[in-house]
Amino acid sequence: PLRRLLCRLSRWMEISLGLDGATNVTSWFGYRRHAEWADVINLHNIHSYYFSLLLLPRMERLAPLVWTLHDMWPLTGGCYYCYACPNWLTGCGRCPETPEHRRGGRAFSRFLHTLRHRVYSRINPVMVTPSRWLLRQVQRSPLTHRFRATCIPYGLDTDVFLPTRKSVAREALGLPPD
């Protein structure tokens, strides 16, 4: 009963403040029993209000961390992709991409970026990306540039997905040549 109330309160607070999984209390219950026997802990999408970033140092004490990225969320103050915004390289803040519905507003992205910096300074995961582009972003990020990182592309059936010249693909899709 108390645990359930605490979890609900934590989720409400995270959603209301736009913390996006930064401090979720729910993940503190039971993580140890799963992590203690692991040879390695492979993280994927840990955002969206179900995991606390604050757990990462504790988890790494139990087993090495491998973090497979699928977007830029771990590199920014909360954006999944930064698009043309360069703020993720300098600490975020006044974010043009942050949804207005977040209570913390656009400046809250600086707080989340700083929180990530503090947590990441206490861990040393191996970062895995599915693309060379995302690997370059990991290497550029002030939050993750010191981590060992590698690219492991998703497996694709090359009999179905055939490489072709960009100009041919753009023409087939009806896109402009540039």
Language-model segments: which ranges?
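A short helix/loop element that forms part of the nucleotide-sugar donor recognition site in Leloir-type
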Residues: 113-116, 162-175
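Membrane-proximal helix-turn-helix segments that form the acceptor-binding/catalytic region
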Residues: 60-61, 73, 85-128, 136, ...
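Short aromatic-enriched loop/helix-cap "lid" or pocket-rim segments at secondary-structure transitions
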Residues: 1, 55, 77-82, 87, ...
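Carbohydrate-associated surface elements
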Residues: 133, 155
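Short N-terminal targeting/anchoring amphipathic segment
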Residues: 30-50, 64-70
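Phosphate- and divalent-cation-binding pockets in alpha/beta enzyme and binding domains
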Residues: 51, 136-140, 160
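A conserved catalytic-core segment of Leloir-type glycosyltransferases
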Residues: 1-40
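Conserved donor-binding/catalytic core segment of Leloir-type glycosyltransferases
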Residues: 128, 174-178
